[in-house]
C-alpha cells in the first residue's frame, strides 16, 4: 500500500499520542508492517532498532480472512531458536468486527535476524524477515556507541608482531581517533601465509608467542576488554567459513569435509583436465613447447594463440572428456536386444512426454551412463517377433544412442571452448596485463594456471593418475580448491552437482585453500559443523563483532547456524560483511537472513569525485530539510547500513591509482557520510603500495609522540595524515552521536565536493569542503581559480582546515622491518579557529537571499588539491530564535520538538492559548470550512482552491487539500515536489492558508489568526526548512481538528476503528453552510435552528447545514441538494455519526417543500424544485423512521412544525411561518396523495427546465395498485427512480428516451413503501401517529384503506409478483418467455416494456434491508448469491447483469457516436459499478446470513470485511478522502464520476454499523 497508508496512520497516531508518552517525554517508536496476500518479502530489508514496537496489520487483501502470524522472535527471556515459531495474538483496540485496526505486535529487545510468515487458514500466504540492529557499548561507563558513529581500522594480524608489542602498534588506531579495530584472522596460518588461509581455526597463531611465553585466546580476550574499557575501542575479527588451508592437519584426517572425488564424483572430469593442464604447465616450464611457440616466458598474444592451438591439438584429443557423459553403445544395444528377445516381453505403454535420454552415471566412469530401458522398449517396438524386426529395432535404438552420445560430445566441446578462454584470460592477467602481477616465466612455483585440486602423491603420467580416481582411499584426498566465480549466482554453490565451474575453468582459484563441504545440515558432515561452531564460539567469546569474509560465497544455512551460535554468547554481536553479488535484491537476502549489521562499501569503487559524493548520499542520512516523520508509521524497505571505507585491505593502493594528495580529501568525504566509516592501517601513514595479505611479513609501526618523521619504525601526529584523521574521526563520532542525520552533497566543480551534515533539531550544520586529487597535482593541471561558495547561515568557526604538503625530508624508501609510509608528505592542520584566521579562506562576505535568507559568501585562496576545510554553521541568530519559538509551540503536538525549542514571552498572545482550546469551540459546519470545500464551494465566497504552478490545483481549499499532497510526499521525503518548490519560492501558499480563514468570522478567524501567528515565525526561517515546518504546523492543527470533529460525533464513531472515523469525516466533508442558503427556511417557531448575521444586510438569517450530493459536481448553487441523494445518505452521514439536529433540520426543510404528495429531487432552495422523481419521498419517509428509532426522543420530530412552502399544489411559494403543520400531517398527506393517485404536468415544462426530455416525459404519474398495494408510476418517457439517465444524443437518436425508465412498480420503492406502511401501522396502534388509514375518493365515493390492509396487501403479493422461481413450471409468471435468470427478484413489476421487469439489477437488495419481512430467507439467499456472482465488483455493484444484451460497463459521457446504447453516456446505469448499492447488498447479506447456519454467517462476515477493505484502501489513497459515485467495470477509474459521493460513503458506514 505504500504511503497511501499515511492517512490511516495519522488517525491511529491520534489515539496513540494520548496514551504512549514515556517518562522522558519521548514517544515510543512503532512501525507498521501491512500483510498482503501472497506477498513474499524475503528480498526486502526491514531494519529496526531495539526498543521499537513492530505491529503486523492486515492489508486489504487479507481483511475478513482467518490470518495467523508466526515468528521465530523469542518470548522475553527465551533463547532464540531459528526453527521454533510461535503464533502472535491479535489485538483489536476497538473490539469491533471491522479489521482495519486489528494488529499483533513484537516488542523488539534482541538483535539479529528474525523470520515471520502468515497463514490464511492453513495455507502459507506470505512472509519475510526483520533485522534488529545490535546495541554497541564501550568505556568504563558502558555508554552506547551508535552504528553511525563507528570509525573502524583494519589491521593485518600477522603484521602486529609478537603479542606483547601489540598495544604499542594498536595505539596508533586509538590516537588516530578510531573506535573499532578489525583484525584479520588471528589463527594459525597455512603454508601460503595468506591472512585468510587458516591451517587451524581453533589455535591462536604461534607467531604471536615468544620462545619463553606462549600466548592464548585468554590473553587476547584480556587485551580486547582493556581496549573496550580504557580506550573506548571495540574489536572485531573475521570468520572464514568457506575454506581451510590445504595443509590443515584436520582436513587430512577428515577429507569428507572437503569436495573430493569420493563425495563429489561429478568433479572427476574436471580433475582429469586439471592434471593434464598441470603436466602441460610443467612441460612449458621445461621448454618442451618452445618450438611450438610456447616458451616459458609468455610475452605476447602470439604465445597465447599458440597455447590455445596446443591445448586443442594435443591435450583435449587425448583426454576424451566426453566419455564421462556417454553411454557404451555396444553394451546398451546388447541389453536392449536381450530384453526384446525375452519371451515375457510385452509392449509397454509409453508416456508421450517421456523421451529417451542419457542417465548420468553417479560415479562418473567413462561410458558409465545408461538409458531407461522401459522408455526404449516403449519407443522402439518391433512389428513382429522375428529376428529381422528385432534387428531393425536394435539399429534404430543404436542410432538414437549414437545421436545422444554425439550431443554430449558437442556439449563437451562447448565446455572445452570456455575452459580454454578462461585459462587464457587467466594467463593474460597474470603474465601480460598492466594491472596484473606480471609473474614472469612459467615455473612449478608459478605454473601456467593455478591448480584446481590438491594432489598429495608422487607425480606420475596422466593415464596412471586417472586410475586413482576410482580408488576411494586415494580419491578422497583429491580436494577441490576454493575461489570465486565472476558473475555467478551467489546463492548457488559452484562446487555442487549441476555446476560445471571446475570443468569450464571458470573459477578464479585460491590454490592455498580447500573448499569446505557442509551439506545441508550438521548430520551431513558432523565433524566440520562441530569444528566450525567451536571456532565461532571462540571468536564470539572474546570479540564484540565479526566480519564475514567472502560472505557471498558462504552457504546461507551455514552462516545462519554459526551466527546463531555466536549470538548466544554475544547477543549484541556486530556483524560486518563484504558482499559482491552485484544486486541489491541478492544483498538483501544475505542481510536479512544473517542479520548483517553493516555492509562494507568501498570508496575506491568511485572513479571520480562526483561518484564519491554520490556514494556519500547513497549510503546514509536523509535530505536536509526533510519532513518530520511520525513515531508511528509504516515500516518502509531500507537499504543495508553501510560501513563506508576509504580503503579496505583488499583494495589496491590509492596513492598509485589516484595520488598521495587525495588521501586527505577522500577520507574527509567518506567520514562525512551518515553511516559507519572505516579505513585500513597504512592509509593514514601514506604507505605507497598495497599491503599484501599474502606476502607482507613486515610489522606495523609503533606510536611514539617524540619520534622524528625520518624514523621508519614509529609514527605520531607528524606522520602522514594521522593528525587530520584524528580530527575527522572525532567529528564523525560527534555527528553520529548528536543526531546530524541530514546530508547534502554539493558537487562544486570537477574536483571539489562539499558535504553538509545537518541536525534537524538544533539546525546546526557542519560543511566539509574537500578538493580531491584523483590526478597527481605535480603532473596534472588544476586551476588556481576556485569557485566562490555560498553557505546559508552564520559560520561559527572553522572546525578544521588541513592541507596536504610536502616537507623537506628524503623521500620514501621501503623499510626492511616496518611497514613505513612517505615521510616527505604530511598535513598542515589547524583546528577550531575563527574564519578570519583561516589560511584557506581569502574573505567571507555576508549577503541575503530573499527577506530572511542569511548567506555567507566564501572566497578561497589556498584550497589546493589535497586540502579540506570544515565549517560549523548555525542559522543566523534571527532565524535560530524563530525556529526555537516554532518548535516550542509545536511541542503541544509532539514531544519530538522539545529539542531546540525556545520559550519567549513576547510572542503573539494567541499563541499562548493551546490550539486545541481555540479549536474546541468550532462546530462541525465550521470544521467543514477549515478542512474541506472544493473549488465551486469556495467560489461562492469569492475564493478558490490553491493552484500550484506547473502542477495542479489542490482538491480542497481547506487543510485537507494540503494534507492529501503532504501525505503523498512526506513518507518519501519528496522535497523536489512542485508543492515544496512553491513553499520555498515564496509565502503565497502560507498566506493563502491563514488568509482564507481570517476573512471569515468567529472561531474560524481565530484558527486563522493562530496559523498566521505561527506562520509569522515560519517566514523568518531559511526557505529550505519551510516545507518541513509548514507540514509540522499543519499536521498538528489538522490532527487536532479531526479529534475535535470526532468528539462531536456519536460514541460509535468516537470508539470506532480508523476506517469508521475515516468514513465519518465524509459527514464533515459533505455537510456545510454556504454563503447562500441551500435549504428552504424552517418554521420560525423552532427555537434551536442555527442563525448567523448576514454580512451584507446585517440581518439575522438561518444557516442550516445542507448535504452536498457529491464533490466536485454537486456541491454548490441549485445543484448542491437533491432529495433522493440527501435521504439515501442521511442515515449514514448524520444519524450514525450523531448529528441529530442537522438531520432533523434537513428532514423538516424538505417536508416544507412537499407538493403533489412528492418530495423534490432537485431542491433548488424549494423555489426551483423539480417534482420529477417517484422515490425521493419514500427515502424521506424512511429517514424519518430511522430518525425516530435512532435518536433519543426521536419520535418528537413527528410533532415538529413544518413550514409549508406549497400548502396546495398550485400555491405560490409561501414565506416561512405563513402556514405551519406538524410533521405527522405532512407524512399523512404524502401517503394519502399516493393512494389517491398523482398525476400532473411539471411547471415550465419544456427545454427551459430539461433540454432533453420529450414532451410526454413532463407528465408525472404515481399511485398505488388497489390489488397489490404496490406503489407504481412513471411512463416510458421519464425516469423517476435513481437510475435516471435521459438520452441526449441526436446522432445516436436516443435524445429524450430514458435509458432506464423503470416505470411500473420499482422493487426498491415497493420495499420502502412497505417499510413506511409497516412503521406507521405500528405507531398508529400505539396512538403515536394519529392516522390509522388513508381516505381517498374513488368513483365519486370516499374510500378508506387502513394501514393494516395496505401492509397486508404488499406482504401477500410481493414474492408472488417479484420472485422468479427456480422451477420453470411455476405458473405465476406472466411472461415466462422473458425469464433469463431464475432464483432472482425482478427489478420492477408491470413495466411498459415487460422485459425490463426481468433484468437483474442490485435494487432488490434495498428492499431486503428496509423490509426484510417481504422475503423468504432461502429465496433471498439464493438471489443474493446470484447478485454476488454477477453484480459485485471491487468497489461497486454492476447496475445491470453482464449477461444482458445492453450491458456495457464503461461510462463515457463525452462519447457521441452512432451506438444507441452508449452515445452520450446512455449506459450510465446499464453496467457501470455504482458504490452506494454495495452497502445495501452487504447489509442484506449480513441480515439473511444470520438466518442461515453459523458457517454461512461466518463466511459472510469474511466477505463483508474483505469487500470493505477495498473501500478502505480507496479512501486512504484518494486525495479527496472520499468514495466515488461509480467506477467503470471491474473497479476501473471513471473520470466522469464524482470523486467523492455522499451516498457512497454513507452506505459503507451503515454497513460497518451493522457489522
Curated annotation (Swiss-Prot):
GO terms for biological process: glycogen biosynthetic process; glycogen catabolic process. The keyword Signal does not apply. The N-terminus is blocked. Ubiquitinated. Coiled coil: none annotated. It is found in: Cytoplasm. SUPFAM superfamilies: (Trans)glycosidases, Six-hairpin glycosidases. Gene3D superfamilies: Glycosidases (3.20.20.80). GO terms for molecular function: 4-alpha-glucanotransferase activity; amylo-alpha-1,6-glucosidase activity. The active site is at 549, 552, 650. It holds the Pfam family hDGE_amylase. It catalyses: Transfers a segment of a (1->4)-alpha-D-glucan to a new position in an acceptor, which may be glucose or a (1->4)-alpha-D-glucan; Hydrolysis of (1->6)-alpha-D-glucosidic branch linkages in glycogen phosphorylase limit dextrin. Monomer. Interacts with NHLRC1/malin. NCBIfam families: glyc_debranch. Multifunctional enzyme acting as 1,4-alpha-D-glucan:1,4-alpha-D-glucan 4-alpha-D-glycosyltransferase and amylo-1,6-glucosidase in glycogen degradation. This is Glycogen debranching enzyme. It comes from Oryctolagus cuniculus. The gene is AGL.
